[in-house]
A protein has these predicted regions:
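N-terminal secretory/targeting leader peptides
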Residues: 2-128, 138-139, 143-305, 309-310
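Positively charged, low-complexity/disordered segments
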Residues: 306-308, 313-321
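Short, Φ-rich (hydrophobic/aromatic) sequence segments
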Residues: 130-133
């Protein structure tokens, strides 16, 4: 109270009066407004889609929360602003500032992107975290990103995935020949060596393509997401484990020119928001996959099984070629 009285006395003695006091007290509002940053983030996944979609939305909201609303992120789910697989180009061209996706979708731009999402028979989520943070992975990621004007952060991980949904039983490597399968990244490159055709299909269109026969098989994520997408209505055979994706990293990709124009504090806010979601997403998948798998088992409409040993060995052989 004493401090407030002294402030009023000072204003009176200076001859400023009540009007000036009002102006001084309201000064921070226009300063904050002038410093307001509006950002567009484009995502691959649908709004409200468990884990992947909600995770990206959480990152955008957390950036706003950590900045006390000063950074406003307009989050566009897949298809709301650009197509689900067009988010990379939208950010590299500068039309949007951030994307939320998985970097293996960009292997057509450079095969190196696949290493920053999932590698067949590669690292699980915790190993990816260790490599990126302490094993030189972030430096390699930055080097690749520089070629495209990007700076990328870890923003989630779906953990070990399932092997996929098939409309025919797989008993040997020969059973893959001629199949059309939706499988991205390095996993798709590997599986193509088994004689199947790799088809690029956004997540929101998989069910339709699988049920109408446009594709014969698909991998997606794991039981939690696969149940939500109702793949059990479109295919009878559900195989595990997902050797192609032992831990799939989700990315917040930033236009580097835009990011480096921000203050160090704002850059740290964006990185921290991503780091928090990287940990939370993995725990969310671990908490939900088991119960979802049990519900799928209880349906008794599908065959859930491990592939034959020969099939697994073939996976490894082709991975090493």
């Amino acid at each position: 109270m004493k401090k407030n009285f002294k402030r009023r006395d000072f204003l009176k003695k200076a001859g400023i009066g009540a009007a000036a006091a009002t102006a001084v007290s309201s000064f921070p509002a226009p300063a904050i407004a002038a410093d307001r940053i509006e950002v567009n983030c484009v995502a691959t996944w649908g709004r409200g889609y468990p884990g992947l979609g909600t995770g990206g939305e959480a990152v955008s909201q957390r950036i706003s929360d950590l900045s006390d609303g000063r950074i406003v992120v307009n989050h566009f789910a897949g298809g709301e602003r650009v197509g689900p697989l067009d988010v990379f180009t939208e950010v590299t061209s500068g039309n949007a500032q951030m994307y939320n996706s998985a970097d293996y979708y960009w292997v057509g731009q450079h095969p190196g992107w696949g290493f920053f999402a999932a590698v067949p028979f590669g690292m699980i989520a915790t190993e990816i975290n260790g490599w990126i943070r302490h094993g030189g992975g972030q430096e390699l990621w930055d080097e690749l990103g520089d070629e495209f004007g990007l700076k990328n952060f870890m923003a989630g991980n779906s953990g070990v995935q399932m092997g996929g949904w098939f409309n025919k039983e797989i008993n040997s490597p020969d059973d893959f020949k001629g199949l059309k399968m939706r499988i991205p990244g390095l996993g798709g490159m590997m599986m193509s060596k088994l004689g199947l055709s790799v088809v690029g299909v956004p997540g929101g269109q998989i069910y339709e393509n699988l049920i109408n026969g446009t594709i014969d098989a698909t991998e997606w994520v794991g039981p939690w997401n696969d149940e939500r997408s109702r793949f059990y209505e479109a295919a009878k055979y559900y195989y595990w484990p997902g050797c192609h994706e032992p831990g799939t990293l989700i990315t917040l990709g930033c236009n580097k020119s835009w990011l480096t124009s921000l203050s160090k504090t704002d850059q740290m806010i964006i990185e921290h928001a991503s780091t928090v979601q990287n940990e939370r997403m993995l725990t969310e998948y671990n908490a939900n996959n088991g119960a979802a798998l049990q519900r799928l088992v209880n349906l008794s409409l599908i065959h859930i099984s491990e592939p034959t040993r020969r099939y697994a060995i073939s996976y490894a052989v082709f991975c090493l070629k």
